[in-house]
Structures are given as structure tokens and as C-alpha cells.
Design a protein with these regions (language model features):
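Conserved alpha-helical segments that form or flank metal/cofactor-binding pockets of metalloenzymes
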Residues: 101-126, 149
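Secondary-structure edge/capping motif, primarily at the C-terminal ends of alpha-helices
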Residues: 82-90, 128-129, 154-165
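N-terminal secretory signal peptides
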Residues: 1-27
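C-terminal segment of N-terminal export signals and the immediately downstream linker at the start
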Residues: 8-9, 46-79, 83-86
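Alpha-helical scaffold segments that form or flank carboxylate-/histidine-based iron centers
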Residues: 58-68, 93-112, 131-144, 170-182
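Preference for long, well-ordered alpha-helical segments
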Residues: 188-237
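Acidic/histidine-rich alpha-helical segments that form the ligand environment
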Residues: 145-163, 169-200
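N-terminal export leaders
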Residues: 26-44
Length: 254
């Protein structure tokens, strides 16, 4: 089982209560496909049955990075949906679930995705390639650092499992600025940085880095970090009443 952090903290207790057998889940660089069921059959949505492993497709390094962004965006959505409640009824906010979300963002997003992949392999190569895209890297690094500061703030004010009245408005403001920053940050990476990085590599280099990223993930988490992160954010959404995708369907225009 994945270990996002050590030491028996709230996240570790959370994981222990929600352990799911992962023997039939593919590696991070494989999507399982079987007829019409497709990749969504991987025990991600309730009621879906895990697919056969008879037909597997490789997942490239860039797709890996963008899927990881998908996990982080789901954390951002949790934070964004919490802001109105912090304004109106902070006592009713589940601080423990928010703490788990911040811990997931720290462990999976900041310590793994940002430090081990982007800052070690992607940004240096983009800088080396030069051009206008390379100039964006400094801003992205600054945002990484600011994000870590905000995450530590969130972890601090949510560590007791409830939100103190005095912390409600500062936390709401932190969520608003954090979400806005990372929405723009990840969008630029997906549409500018990752394509530039891919174009700077040969096909063999890209394949080698994809394998290296998987090795880093296994060393960091002891298993499939992406699949476990998807489970964790799903459980956090469930705890906060945000698991039903249909509730976010926009109403018709009037």
C-alpha cells in the first residue's frame, strides 16, 4: 500500500480505514481496456467492475504528468467548494477532510510531482531549449514555493479537525488565491511547458524518462502512487458530499 508520509498521522489513519485491494489495478503507465468498459473500469467509480488485463496500453510520460494534474485539480475543486461554507458556517466544515486534501496535495503534488519530476527533469530541459517558453519557468518555480507556503498554512489551521472562527476567513482567502494560482499554473504547464519539454526530447529519451518517472514513483510511494491518490481524493470528496459528479452539471441558460 502507498505511504503518503510516515509516522501514523491523520492521513495514515485515514488510509488504514479505507484500504482497498489493489492487485487488479494496473501500473501507472498502463491503462486497462476491455471492449466498451475501457479504462474507467478500474474500480474508480462505484459499481464498476475491474476490467481484464488482457489488453493493456502504455501510458506515456506526458499523459502521466497530465493525469497527475487531474488529481491535483480535484483537490483544488474541493478547496473551492469549501469557500462559501467557510464564509457562512465554518463550524460545519469538515476540517479533517480538508487536512487530508492538503496532505495529499503536499505529498503527491509538491514533494513528488513538483520536486521529483518537474523541478528535476522538466524545467531544466525546457530552460536548456531556450526561447519564450523558458522564461515561464521562473514564475512556475515561484508559484511552487508560494503554494508550499499556503499548503503549510492549510495543514496548520485544519490539524485539529475543525476550523476555528478566527481562521475561517483567512482560510477562505488562502483557498481562493491558491485555487486561482494553480488553475492558471497547471493550465500553462499542460499547454505550454509539457509540449515544449516533449519537443525537446527524442522518442527514446521520452520513453526512458517515462520509465524513470515510474521508478521514482515506486521509490517514493512503494507502489502505484497515481492510483492510490485517485482513491484518496475520491474518499475526501465522499466525506465532503462532493462525490456525485451530477451535482456540478450546469443549469440551462435563461
Amino acid at each position: 500500500m502507498l505511504a503518503f508520509g510516515e509516522g501514523g498521522g491523520p492521513l495514515e489513519d485515514f488510509l488504514g480505514r479505507n484500504a482497498i485491494v489493489t492487485a487488479m489495478i494496473p501500473s501507472r503507465r498502463q491503462l486497462m481496456t476491455s471492449g466498451s468498459a475501457g479504462a474507467l473500469g478500474v474500480a474508480v467509480l462505484p459499481g464498476l467492475v475491474a476490467c481484464s488485463r488482457s489488453d493493456e496500453k502504455d501510458v506515456g510520460a506526458v499523459e502521466d504528468l497530465m493525469r497527475e494534474h487531474g488529481v491535483l485539480r480535484r483537490v483544488l475543486l474541493v478547496f473551492a467548494e469549501t469557500v462559501p461554507k467557510l464564509h457562512s458556517a465554518p463550524d460545519a466544515v469538515d476540517g479533517a477532510a480538508l487536512n487530508k486534501g492538503a496532505k495529499l496535495f503536499h505529498d503527491f503534488g509538491e514533494e513528488y510531482h513538483e520536486r521529483k519530476l518537474e523541478e528535476t527533469y522538466i524545467f531544466p530541459r525546457v530552460r536548456k531549449a531556450g526561447g519564450e517558453v523558458a522564461a515561464v519557468v521562473d514564475t512556475l518555480l515561484e508559484q511552487h514555493q508560494r503554494g508550499r507556503e499556503i499548503t503549510q498554512f492549510v495543514l496548520g489551521v485544519t490539524k485539529k479537525g475543525r476550523i476555528a472562527t478566527a481562521d475561517a476567513e483567512p482560510l477562505a482567502r488562502a483557498f481562493e488565491t491558491f485555487v486561482l494560482m494553480y488553475q492558471n499554473h497547471t493550465a500553462r504547464e499542460d499547454t505550454i511547458i509539457f509540449p515544449a519539454w516533449k519537443n525537446a526530447l527524442t522518442g527514446s529519451e521520452l520513453d526512458e524518462l517515462g520509465d524513470k518517472f515510474e521508478d521514482i514513483e515506486k521509490a517514493q510511494f512503494g507502489g502505484d502512487g497515481f492510483e492510490e491518490a485517485v482513491k484518496q481524493i475520491g474518499n475526501i470528496e465522499q466525506a465532503l458530499g462532493l462525490a456525485d459528479l451530477a451535482q456540478f452539471t450546469a443549469p440551462p441558460p435563461r
